[in-house]
Amino acid sequence: MKGLMGRKVGMTQIFNEDGIVTPVTVIEVAENVVTQIKSDETDGYNSVQVGYGEKKIKNTIKPLQGHFEKAGTTPKRTMKEFRVDSTEGFTAGQELKADLFQAGDKVDVTGISKGKGFQGVIKRHGQSRGPMAHGSRYHRRPGSMGASAYPGRVFKGKNLPGHMGNVQVTAQNLEIVRVDLEKNLLLIKGAVPGPKKGVLVIQTTVKQGK
């Protein structure tokens, strides 16, 4: 499994040779550095720990300062571990760039979705509204919530109004349309979670379908 962290730049569109337009999300994947190598011999499994984003030394706790110094790099704001079949080709302090992926690769993109605040059931869960006529008292309310005297309660998981968004979301099996090696950019087909400048995790998809 290959993986990088990046920052969402925004969306645009590109045209192929036949003039077909494809909406893409632009993700900048600069500043990825290997901070630790884990192997079967030392940890019982193979993985590569990657750090992303610069962080001031004064804001980094002493144990992590030593961790980054051992890897020969500066403190990083975010760290993520990617499981790999083999750690060959990876070394501590190595900088990972966009060439880790190629056009046509399928990836999963994970990010924190946009926060929407407190929302009702129509926006939050896609429920239908009631009649909007003058005589109706039921427009955008949740409606019936349960049964009668038995069980006499609302079941857990019932779709109700509440806080919407600001949770971790993964968009699966997205295609990388283009890789810009000069600017360290990945152009991924479609939309991905999160706002502009949001930190994303891009890794090989778990759905190895056709």
Curated annotation (Swiss-Prot):
Q: Which residues cross the membrane?
A: none
Q: Looking at the keywords, is Ribonucleoprotein present?
A: yes
State a single Pfam family of this protein: Ribosomal_L3
Region (Disordered) location: 123-144
> Which PROSITE patterns does the record cross-reference, listed alphabetically?
RIBOSOMAL_L3
Give the GO cellular component terms, alphabetically: cytosolic large ribosomal subunit
Quick one: a GO biological-process term for this protein?
translation
Q: What does this protein do?
A: One of the primary rRNA binding proteins, it binds directly near the 3'-end of the 23S rRNA, where it nucleates assembly of the 50S subunit.
The family assignment reads: Belongs to the universal ribosomal protein uL3 family.
Question: What name does the UniProt record give this protein?
Answer: Large ribosomal subunit protein uL3
Instruction: Say which species the protein is native to.
Output: Alkaliphilus metalliredigens (strain QYMF)
